[in-house]
Amino acid sequence: MKNKAIYPGTFDPITYGHIDILTRAAGMFDTVLLAIAASARKNPMFSLEERVALAKEVTQHLPNVEVVGFCELMANFAKKQQATILIRGVRSVSDFEYEWQLANMNRHFAPDLDSVFLLPSQNLSFVSSSLIKDVARHDGDVSTFLPEVVATAMLQKLGKR
């Protein structure tokens, strides 16, 4: 039986931290769906289509990863995709508390959906998309946190290139 995992998130933008978690998940499961949430309430910098396109570009080296956009309840999306594993990156205790609640809510709606928590590599444990956007808005160098194509797209969005 093939195992299919979903790694959901807003990925606004996708960072080396996300790619670190995704790469390790791709080594653990037959198929990993990088599921990019529309997340309109978060007022994303990039449209869903842009985030999907950037993610596809920077994950080409992972043959068992598929990038898809979605805009529904994660548990329902997982059922439709016939996925039984939900991948989540956990950087801190506060992340874990939130993820634990989310895992229990997902399990309420999809009892066969198990959450697997992965810790980022130590050098990426402080990286978050929102922090990187803030650094970029204040003219900080974000090139060590983002693939070049993503950094370029972000700087263009900010009118800095």
Curated annotation (Swiss-Prot):
UniProt subcellular location: Cytoplasm
CDD domains: PPAT
GO cellular component: cytoplasm
Xref: Gene3D superfamilies: HUPs
Keyword hit for Magnesium: yes
Record site feature (Transition state stabilizer), residues: H18
Domain of life: Bacteria
GO molecular function, one term: ATP binding
Sorted UniProt keywords: ATP-binding, Coenzyme A biosynthesis, Cytoplasm, Magnesium, Nucleotide-binding, Nucleotidyltransferase, Transferase
Principal EC category: transferase
Required cofactor names: Mg(2+)
Protein task: Reversibly transfers an adenylyl group from ATP to 4'-phosphopantetheine, yielding dephospho-CoA (dPCoA) and pyrophosphate.
Record text on subunit structure and interactions: Homohexamer.
Family: Belongs to the bacterial CoaD family.
Protein name per its UniProtKB record: Phosphopantetheine adenylyltransferase
Species per Swiss-Prot/TrEMBL record: Proteus mirabilis (strain HI4320)
